Swiss-Prot record:
Description of its domains: The histidine box domains are involved in binding the catalytic metal ions.
Region Disordered, residue ranges: 1-20
One annotated Gene Ontology cellular component of this protein: membrane
CDD domains, per database record: Delta12-FADS-like
UniProt GO BP: unsaturated fatty acid biosynthetic process
Name of the molecule in the record: sn-1 acyl-lipid omega-3 desaturase (ferredoxin)
Record key words, sorted: Fatty acid biosynthesis, Fatty acid metabolism, Iron, Lipid biosynthesis, Lipid metabolism, Membrane, Oxidoreductase, Transmembrane, Transmembrane helix
Length: 359
């Protein structure tokens, strides 16, 4: 795979995976390189992107309803599912408090963005916080973390199918059951995901989501199951595929290291991500492929990530990673190359089931 600036120096032939070195730059160095205005949300701009997405979604519904043609529906499904995903990314900014400096506004727009696409805003926001605090940590990361070679060999067939073959539909299951080998639900305040002080936030999002399910049920009662399928269920599935595809590719790549124990640090984990180019939809889904800078500084609004990325590249040098491959090729390569990591070692890499574990 061609990378923008580096191959991650994957030690294919080394006898140890211990990593006791320090990075040649600090979090402070990276922050100093980024223009101060990149950290400042612009409420007008943030609201523009939210209402832009809502407007496009509304127009797509109007056109689909007017034409009511099976020739158009496949186009509608793809476009509307993509816009559901774009709306999710707006709520993602709200969850990071990078939409605005007003928490009430972030929570309001977050719920307006996430509830219609059946995402519990606060429940997801909190678990996503756990992911960002532990990115690249095999033991503590929340999503898309690797299994070890021994875990892979002992994994039941049904779990292998879910993890390696139908993972692009995994998100709804994750909301109910959390990631493999972890317990908890995004809907229940008693889940280990949440602190007692977060109870009412979680309940609020859950109640609103139940209300959305009730609304869908009422509309289905009025207009029938075919209405639900044509106008909501299929776009929702497209959205789920987008969400799982993008988040999987953020952190699943043979050249990206994973850490255990004391060799893991926040910054090492944050830069163990990769930027990817999603072509025509790159800006439609709000530059979410610009992921390295986002993981380092969560409070940068999505519309400032490209500028921030260009600022940190010279500081990071060979530690900055960007794939120039087409997305379909990156997905294929990750699927056939990233099955498990070695059972031991403080710095390890994915390997394929068809190859010996990388040292």
């Amino acid at each position: 795979m061609q990378l923008d600036t580096i191959s991650f120096n994957n030690p294919l032939n080394s006898e140890t995976s211990e990593d006791t070195t320090k990075l040649p730059f600090t979090l402070g160095d990276l922050k100093a390189a980024i223009p101060a205005e990149c950290f400042q949300p612009n409420v007008t701009k943030s609201l523009f992107y939210f209402f832009r997405d809502i407007l496009i979604i509304g127009l797509l519904y109007a056109v689909a309803s007017y034409l009511d043609s099976w020739l158009f529906f496949p186009i509608f499904w793809l476009m509307q599912g993509t816009m559901f995903w774009a709306l999710f990314v707006v709520g993602h900014d709200c969850g990071h408090q990078s939409f605005s400096k007003q928490k009430w506004l972030n929570d309001l727009i977050g719920h307006l963005s996430h509830t219609p696409i059946l995402v519990p805003y606060h429940g997801w926001r909190i678990s996503h916080r756990t992911h960002h605090k532990n990115t690249g940590n095999i033991d503590n990361d929340e999503s898309w973390y690797p299994v070890t070679e021994s875990q892979y060999k002992d994994m039941p067939l049904a779990q292998k199918i879910g993890r390696y073959y139908v993972f692009l539909l995994a998100y709804p299951v994750y909301l109910f059951k959390r990631s493999p080998n972890k317990e908890g639900s995004h809907f229940l305040p008693s889940s280990s995901l949440f602190k007692p002080s977060e109870k009412w936030d979680v309940l609020t999002s859950t109640v609103l989501l139940i209300g959305m399910v009730g609304l869908l049920g009422f509309l289905t009662y009025q207009w029938g199951w075919m209405w639900l399928l044509k106008y909501y269920a299929v776009p929702y599935l497209v959205f789920i595929v987008w969400l799982d595809l993008v988040t999987f590719l953020h952190h699943t790549e043979p050249e990206l290291p994973w850490y255990r124990g004391e060799d893991w640090t926040f910054l090492k984990g944050a830069i163990s991500s990769i930027d990817r180019d999603y072509g025509l939809v790159y800006h439609i889904h709000h530059d979410i492929g610009t992921h390295v800078a986002h993981h380092i500084f969560l409070n940068i609004p999505h519309y400032n990530l490209l500028k921030a990325t260009e600022a940190i590249k010279p500081v990071m040098g060979e530690y900055f990673h960007k794939s120039e491959e087409p997305i379909w090729k990156s997905l294929w390569n990750s699927c056939i190359s990233c099955h498990f990591v070695p059972d031991t070692g403080s710095k390890v890499y994915y390997t394929s089931k068809n190859k010996s574990a990388k040292a």
